[in-house]
């Protein structure tokens, strides 16, 4: 007897649609105890542990970077430490979409975990070579594609109306990374034990890998395509040319954006070369995807036209929320350091205050995510959430050295909705995607968030960098009493710029002739006020982006009718993972019902 596709005279693409229908289920029809079975529980544990280990390593190592440099030596490539991680994660997510839709998710999860462990080992053994650590960060960034896509891996296992509950379960332990990660990283750095950041990462990721290897058996290649199509045939259909142009364009452009302004000026040949070549590569990629008639495009262009109220709005909201997340997650700790460091008593107090935004983001995901499907009225939730974030970003613009309590409250309130709104867009886009294209649809929205975050990181940093010198001049000179004269102004100006560059105000400045504790206090206050004024422009900029999110939310289609019991994919026992459902005893029932659905869609 031939393969099911041959017996039923099914074309390969139509067979994929029929199998996608057969692989899906209604939550009420799943076997009793399915979600409490060891294979499902351990799958959730595996994905949750990888999420925790990845973002712990990222947050903790970023907090300990100064201690890492002090230990293994300085490098002109320090700015690449976080940049290559972000760029690599974006590329990993984009490529993950199409490849895992075609070849299955299991290999991607196991492969990225192994790549991450290798990257962690590379960080451990980067003795006296910071460039070795940069290379290891590339591997860690590629491995971070998996936790960046955990909303897909968990979402496809849950019904439409309970997807966010699955995300809440996985994200719950991540408070250790987002809330406590910077504090733990700085503490380990101060005690000379920064390598334990990567020991912890390797240990947790190894446990996650073992759990995934034993229990994680999502639809396999045979279940997705049958046994008529070989992996070699499918590999030949992959859009490798498009993948090359996309990877090259993204890498060049994001490196140019990240390096622009600091350490290199925007008009330098290096930055212009990176930006222009990156944009040209991305344009070539889009044209190639549109006109080359590829069987398996990396990003299908048909997603974009005529779907603004669905896919288009999700792209806009995801991009804006990613940018706002950047404004809060990256800029706020710097703001705390620049404005409040002279008034906070210890590094512990600085670290805890810098973590409030992370706690807010985690609390919002856990709290609002649990109520998402109960409140319904999704479009109004998006409108209210976008307006909430925009309003509190405006409140953040009012923060100065006299408003420490307000800064803590506003950062928590802003983060409370940002994390939830980011995740919502990546869940909602799964509602409007066919089950066989869940990965590629998700990857575009998720990568948009990361790309916009990188772009606006550079824009925000450039904005406050440009505004700060003028603000310092306008606030410092009037603050110096006339009786101190010109020498006092020069001394204060020198200290102010040194304080602005280093963020430190050690007592040995009192040894300079004419310098007094009053002069130091005046300088600290002027620098803090100048930074507060400069950062306010960043939040005004972010508010303008928030208006875009509000408009996109108002234009979003009604998603409430998608809150059904439909479950796209399941976790199987290992012995059932390679069974073609169209070749099973129930194939006739599956094929007949699936064929009706496919014909109705067409």
Curated annotation (Swiss-Prot):
GO cellular component: plasma membrane
Coiled-coil segments on the chain, per record: none
Keywords: Cell membrane, Glycoprotein, Membrane, Transmembrane, Transmembrane helix, Transport
Membrane topology: Multi-pass membrane protein
Residues bearing glycans: 160, 590
Subcellular location: Cell membrane
GO MF term (any one): transmembrane transporter activity
Bilayer-crossing regions: 49-69, 77-97, 107-127, 134-154, 164-184, 196-216, 240-260, 271-291, 297-317, 355-375, 380-400, 408-428, 450-470, 484-504, 532-552
Record function comment: Efflux pump that provides the dual role of trichothecene export and self-protection by allowing the fungus to evade the harmful effect of its own trichothecene production.
Similarity field: Belongs to the major facilitator superfamily.
Protein name (Swiss-Prot/TrEMBL): Trichothecene efflux pump TRI12
Organism whose genome encodes this protein: Trichoderma arundinaceum
């Amino acid at each position: 007897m031939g393969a099911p596709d041959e017996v039923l005279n099914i074309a390969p693409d139509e067979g994929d649609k029929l199998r996608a229908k057969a692989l899906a289920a209604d939550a009420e029809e799943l076997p009793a105890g399915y979600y409490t079975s060891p294979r499902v529980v351990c799958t959730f544990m595996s994905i949750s542990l990888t999420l925790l280990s990845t973002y712990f390593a990222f947050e903790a190592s970023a907090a300990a970077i100064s201690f890492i440099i002090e230990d293994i030596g300085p490098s002109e490539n320090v700015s690449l430490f976080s940049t290559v991680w972000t760029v690599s994660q974006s590329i990993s997510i984009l490529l993950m979409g199409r490849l895992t839709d075609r070849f299955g998710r299991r290999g991607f999860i196991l492969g990225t975990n192994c790549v991450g462990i290798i990257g962690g080992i590379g960080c451990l053994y980067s003795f006296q070579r910071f460039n070795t650590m940069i290379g290891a960060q590339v591997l860690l960034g590629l491995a971070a594609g998996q936790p960046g896509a955990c909303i897909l891996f968990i979402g496809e296992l849950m019904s439409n109306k309970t997807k966010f509950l699955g995300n809440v379960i996985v994200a719950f332990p991540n408070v250790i990374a987002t809330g406590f990660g910077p504090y733990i990283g700085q503490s380990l750095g101060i005690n000379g034990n920064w390598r334990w950041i990567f020991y912890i990462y390797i240990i947790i990721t190894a446990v996650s890998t073992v759990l995934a290897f034993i229990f994680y058996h999502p639809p396999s290649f045979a279940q997705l395509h049958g046994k008529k199509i070989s992996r070699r045939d499918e590999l030949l259909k992959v859009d490798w040319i498009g993948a090359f142009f996309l990877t090259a364009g993204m890498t060049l452009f994001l490196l140019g954006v990240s390096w622009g302004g600091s350490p290199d000026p925007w008009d330098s040949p290096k930055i212009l070369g990176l930006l222009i070549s990156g944009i040209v590569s991305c344009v070539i990629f889009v044209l190639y995807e549109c006109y080359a008639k590829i069987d398996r495009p990396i990003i299908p262009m048909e997603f974009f036209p005529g779907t603004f109220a669905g896919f288009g709005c999700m792209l806009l909201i995801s991009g804006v929320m990613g940018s706002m997340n950047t404004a809060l997650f990256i800029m706020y700790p710097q703001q705390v350091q620049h404005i409040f460091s002279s008034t906070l008593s210890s590094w512990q107090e600085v670290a805890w205050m810098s973590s409030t935004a992370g706690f807010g983001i985690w609390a919002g995901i856990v709290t609002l995510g649990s109520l998402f499907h109960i409140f319904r009225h999704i479009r109004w939730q998006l409108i209210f959430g976008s307006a909430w974030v925009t309003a509190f970003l405006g409140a953040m613009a009012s923060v100065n050295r006299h408003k420490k309590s307000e800064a803590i409250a506003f950062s928590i309130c802003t983060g409370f909705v940002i994390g939830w709104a980011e995740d919502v867009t990546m869940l909602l886009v799964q509602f409007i995607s066919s089950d066989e294209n869940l990965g590629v649809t998700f990857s575009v929205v998720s990568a948009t968030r990361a790309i916009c975050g990188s772009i606006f990181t550079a824009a925000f940093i450039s904005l406050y960098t440009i505004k700060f010198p003028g603000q310092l001049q306008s606030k410092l000179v009037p603050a110096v009493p006339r009786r101190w004269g010109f020498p006092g102004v020069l001394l204060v100006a020198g200290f102010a710029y040194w304080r602005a560059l280093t963020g430190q105000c050690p007592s040995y400045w009192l040894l300079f002739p004419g310098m007094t504790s009053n002069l130091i206090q005046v300088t600290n206050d002027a620098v803090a006020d100048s930074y507060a004024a400069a950062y306010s422009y960043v939040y005004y900029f972010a508010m303008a982006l928030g208006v875009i999110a509000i408009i996109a939310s108002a234009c979003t289609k009604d998603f409430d009718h998608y809150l059904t019991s439909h479950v796209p994919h399941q976790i199987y026992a290992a012995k059932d993972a390679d069974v073609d459902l169209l070749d099973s005893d129930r194939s006739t029932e599956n094929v007949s019902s699936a064929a009706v659905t496919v014909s109705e869609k067409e």
